[in-house]
A protein has these predicted regions:
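Conserved beta-hairpin
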Residues: 68-109
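Short, surface-exposed beta-strand-loop junctions and turns on beta-sheet-rich folds
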Residues: 106-109, 116-118, 132-135, 143
Length: 162
């Protein structure tokens, strides 16, 4: 099965963020905790005033939240900009015994063994090599539900789901 596509910046960033949720690196509850943690310093300042300890605590909490926001929202876009090959068309040929990968300056033939399992959500397939190394396949590239099902079956024949 031949798949051809070009990532958009928004699509790549969206796939990156959704992978965090899919693999439970970040859970929705974590985002709620982050939002409430922003209120803690305000409450402490209101109740106890602007002491040195509470000011330092506020800096730590806000720094932590800024780092999480940067990793979750900004880093995917930066990664897309940094790697030129993400801007060019990808051609992936999935066969029973191998996967042929052709993208910009990268041409390689891989055995299925390089990948451990696959995951999917409503918009993407993630073909996972290591814990955080994966190939992102947008589902928008499939012309029909039959093609999508055939690709899913091909993945199921060669890989497991975690």
């Amino acid at each position: 099965m031949l798949l051809e596509f070009t990532y958009t910046k928004k699509e790549y960033a969206d796939g990156w963020r959704r992978f965090f949720f899919l693999t439970k690196v970040i859970k929705k509850f974590d985002l709620v905790v982050m939002a409430f943690s922003l209120l803690i310093p305000l409450y402490l300042f209101y109740q106890y005033g602007f002491t040195r300890f509470y000011i330092m605590l506020a800096f730590v909490i806000y720094f932590f939240n800024i780092v999480i926001v940067a990793v979750f929202f900004i880093r995917p876009y930066m990664f897309y900009q940094e790697y030129e090959q993400l801007h060019h068309p990808y051609k992936l040929l999935f066969e029973d015994d191998k996967i042929t990968f052709d993208a910009h300056a990268i041409h390689s033939t891989l055995s299925w063994d390089i990948y451990k399992h696959y995951m999917e959500n409503k918009d993407y397939f993630y073909i996972i090599q290591k814990k955080r190394t994966y190939a992102l396949i947008p589902k928008r590239i499939f012309a029909s539900e039959n093609e999508l099902s055939a690709f899913r079956q091909l993945l199921t024949d060669h890989l497991t789901t975690p």
